[in-house]
A protein has these predicted regions:
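ABC ATPase nucleotide-binding domain helical subdomain, centered on the C-loop/LSGGQ "ABC signature"
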Residues: 58-59, 127, 131-146, 153-154, ...
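A short, proline-enriched helix->beta-strand linker immediately N-terminal to the Walker B motif
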Residues: 175-179
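ABC ATPase NBD coupling module
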Residues: 1-9, 13, 17-24, 28, ...
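Conserved ABC ATPase signature
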Residues: 155-160, 164
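Short catalytic/signature loops enriched in Gly
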Residues: 74-77, 147-150, 243-349
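P-loop NTP-binding/switch modules centered on Walker-like glycine-rich loops
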Residues: 182-186, 190-272
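Short helical segment in ABC ATPase nucleotide-binding domains corresponding to the A-loop/adjacent helical element
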Residues: 105, 111-124, 134, 138, ...
Length: 350
C-alpha cells in the first residue's frame, strides 16, 4: 500500500506548503517521464540493459518546508539508496546528485579556505585520508582551470573572482563523481565572457565524468548552446518537451512561441520589443484548463475548460496544447519566429 505522500517518479506531483496556511503550492505537475540520466545522453528509456545503474527504481515523496523528522512519512529510493530519515540524504547529496547554484558569491563559506571546502566533501563521501583528499582537490582545481592551484589552495573565497568561485563550486560538485549535476542558473551572476567559459567547462567535463546535466535557465541562448533535450515549464507544468533543434525549428506551444518572440535579437529597429501580456497564475489556486490560457492570444474556448493532454508531434517532441488536436483550427506560428534560425544567424553576423 502506498504510504502518505509517497509517489512514483513516473508521475510526480510535488507540493510545497505550510500546514498552518493549509495551502499547497503545486510546483511541478505531471512529470510524464521517470527522471533518468537518459534525459541528456539519449538512452532508450525502454532498453532495460542501458537503464541499469542509472535509476533502476525511483520513488519520490512530497516534502513540506516546515516538516520535522517526526512528521516524515513514506520513503524515497534513488538508485537503490533508501531514504527514510533526513540524515539519509547524505548518501545522495554530493555523491549521486550535485548542484551548482547561480550565485558563486554566496555558494562558498567565506571563513573556510577553498581547499578545505573541497576536501571536506571528498572525505565525507570517500574513504580517503586528508593527504589523498588534498591531492584529489588539487587535481580538480587544475581541471576546472584554476591557475597555480597549489598556491591558491589555502586562499579564502574573497581572494577569488566571481568566475573563479564558480569554477570552485563546479569542482566541489564533481568531487565525488555524481551521476546527475543540477545547474541552477549557474551563469546568471557572471559577465558574458565568463558565462561562455563556464558553459564550455561544464560540457567539457561532462565527457570525462559522464554525468547527466539538468540545466535550469530562462536564457534561451544558453539552452541552444548546452542542451540536447529541452523541457519548457509554465506554472509548474511541462508544456513542451523536445530535442533542442526541434524546439527552435518547430516549436508548437503558444508559450514557447511567446518565449522565442521575446528574444531581443529578433527585434527590428524602431519597433517595440515583444512581451507576454498578463501575469502567471497563482500556484496556490487550482488551475482549470490550460494555465497559459489567460495570456494566450491563440486561446480556444476549450483551453478555459479542460486541461490539454500531451500531444505527440514526433517520437522526441511533445506539446501540451489543444492547438495540436486534429479538430482545432489551423494556426500559424507568429511571423517573428518564422525562419528563426536564419534570423538569429543574421543577428549574430554568422
Amino acid at each position: 500500500t502506498r504510504k502518505r505522500n509517497e509517489i512514483l517518479a513516473k508521475e510526480i506531483y510535488l507540493s510545497v506548503g505550510r500546514y498552518k496556511l493549509r495551502k499547497k503550492v503545486r510546483m511541478i505537475k505531471k512529470l510524464h517521464e521517470a527522471f533518468k540520466a537518459a534525459m541528456e545522453r539519449g538512452v532508450d528509456l525502454n532498453d532495460e540493459q542501458k537503464r541499469n545503474g542509472v535509476f533502476d527504481q525511483a520513488t519520490f515523496r512530497v516534502r513540506y518546508l516546515d516538516e520535522t523528522p517526526e512528521q516524515l512519512h513514506g520513503t524515497c529510493i534513488i538508485n537503490l539508496a533508501k531514504i527514510q530519515d533526513p540524515n539519509d540524504w547524505g548518501q545522495i547529496r554530493g555523491k549521486k546528485i550535485a548542484t551548482v547554484f547561480q550565485d558563486p558569491m554566496t555558494s562558498l563559506n567565506p571563513i573556510i579556505t577553498i581547499g578545505k571546502q573541497i576536501t571536506s566533501v571528498i572525505m565525507k563521501h570517500q574513504d580517503v585520508s586528508e593527504v589523498e583528499a588534498r591531492a584529489q582537490a588539487l587535481e580538480l582545481m587544475e581541471k576546472v582551470g584554476i591557475p597555480n592551484a597549489e598556491q591558491r589552495f589555502d586562499d579564502y573565497p574573497f581572494q577569488y573572482s566571481g568566475g573563479m568561485r564558480q569554477r570552485i563550486v563546479i569542482a566541489i560538485a564533481l568531487s565525488c563523481r555524481p551521476k546527475i549535476l543540477i545547474c541552477d542558473e549557474p551563469t546568471t551572476a557572471l559577465d558574458v565572457t565568463i558565462q561562455a567559459q563556464i558553459l564550455k567547462l561544464i560540457k567539457d567535463l561532462q565527457k570525462e565524468y559522464n554525468y547527466t546535466i539538468v540545466f535550469i535557465t530562462h536564457d534561451l541562448g544558453v539552452v541552444a548552446n548546452i542542451a540536447d533535450r529541452v523541457a519548457v515549464l509554465y506554472a509548474g507544468q511541462i508544456i513542451e518537451f523536445a530535442n533542442v533543434e526541434e524546439l527552435f525549428y518547430d516549436p508548437r506551444h503558444p508559450y514557447t512561441w511567446a518565449l522565442l518572440s521575446s528574444l531581443p535579437q529578433l527585434a527590428e529597429r524602431n519597433t517595440k520589443l515583444f512581451s507576454i501580456t498578463g501575469t502567471p497564475p497563482s500556484l496556490y489556486n487550482k488551475i482549470i484548463g490550460d494555465p497559459f490560457a489567460p495570456r494566450n492570444q491563440y486561446c480556444l474556448k476549450i483551453d478555459t475548460l479542460e486541461e490539454p493532454p500531451m500531444f505527440k508531434v514526433t517520437d522526441t517532441h511533445y506539446a501540451k496544447t489543444w492547438l495540436l488536436d486534429p479538430r482545432a483550427p489551423k494556426t500559424e506560428k507568429p511571423e517573428a519566429i518564422q525562419n528563426i534560425h536564419e534570423k538569429l544567424l543574421k543577428a549574430y553576423n554568422l
